[in-house]
Amino acid sequence: MTTACLPLRVELTNTDTTASSSTLKQICATVISEGGYEIRGNAAEAKLPIGSPRDLTVASTVYPLISLRLKSTRLDGIAILDSLNVLGITNNANYCWEIVQGGTTSGGTWVTNSSSSLVEYNITATSYSLGAGEVLTAGYAVGSNQGSTTAELHRDNLFEYQLERNSFTSTPVELILVASSDTAGADVLASLGWQETNR
């Protein structure tokens, strides 16, 4: 099974000539996974280069750091975000980060790790709009010359972070790591990792 997130499908096929039309009445169906689910796939990641942190130019303004989406040619793919790292590198700056699903990034370039990857990412976007999107999780970090705190993704329900597609419009839904700071010009580094289970 390559796309376990799609609906069940039942078909009736005649293998021989029949005297009348065949009918099939399907009442219900169930899929059960005993023993839970362990994500096993190809690991991939996107990160801001160590020498090019994102500059949060205006205080309290939210900037996109990394955006992910399924490739338009791989909308049947299953990719699940499984790691997050946000590191504020400006001394005495406080940072707020969020994982947003369904927002839209503007500017920058969408690239991919490899031709076989299900996912493309954008680390150069200039702005983003929440629109009809929603914040899945959020947190805070602080930059200090005594040692900065880092952010981590809660791993209790990773399926909440599965990359989605709009099946009615055949378009991918963006998953965006955004951040803001209380200090104008604060710099931040970030990375996102994910598993691709049906490459």
Sequence positions of predicted segments:
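Generic structural motif
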Residues: 15-17, 92, 102-104, 182, ...
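Terminal beta-strand-rich extracellular "head" domains
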Residues: 102-154
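C-terminal interaction-tip segments
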Residues: 31, 170-172, 180-199
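Noncatalytic modules at the cell exterior or secretory-pathway interfaces
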Residues: 3-16, 84, 162-183
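Non-catalytic interaction/regulatory modules that flank or connect domains
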Residues: 67-116
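Beta-sandwich interaction modules
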Residues: 140-174
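Ligand-recognition surfaces built from glycine- and aromatic
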Residues: 1-77, 95-97
